[in-house]
Amino acid sequence: MNAFTSFTKIAAGSLLVAAAAFAGPFYPAGATTLHFAFEGSPNGDRPIVRPPAIYHADDGFGFVDSPGLIGTALGVTAPKYFRFDVNLPAGTYEVTVTLGGTREESVTSIKAENHQPMVSDVHVARGEKAVKTFTVTVKHGAKGDTSLESDGRLTLEFEGTNPSLMKLDIKPGAKPGG
């Protein structure tokens, strides 16, 4: 077992404990909110996710197609683009992101599920942060359907100039448009 496998198993285990109303293959029933941190040190219900935490279905979360992704004590960033996926049961979710925190100014736009714009051009000064919340619906398609819209995962695409992410919270049962 290499360090990455060890880390993802520990992070996934921490996430499972944190995910005590999600139902599905990855989350036990009763979870209220999933918490991910991309900065700082482990904090109870918020596992730290650092590159190269590549998405694997068994782990249930990770980065996908994210060239140039850099992890620091202040969060993750890339020159222009990165993507983070999370296995989720079909449903509507309230997603809260904390952007910024990196050593450079960042401009971040977020797309979710089949490239739907959720957040546009959030400018964050060096060392500062911004919190944004949006609602997204995760769908499950027919077996073998691998489109970003119906693959059983929440797909979040971060793009812009030095797009950055410090924290991610996912809460089930949000009302569409809310």
PLM region descriptions:
Residues 2-14:
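Bacterial N-terminal signal peptides that target proteins for export
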Residues 22-178:
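Compositionally biased, intrinsically disordered or flexible polar/acidic segments
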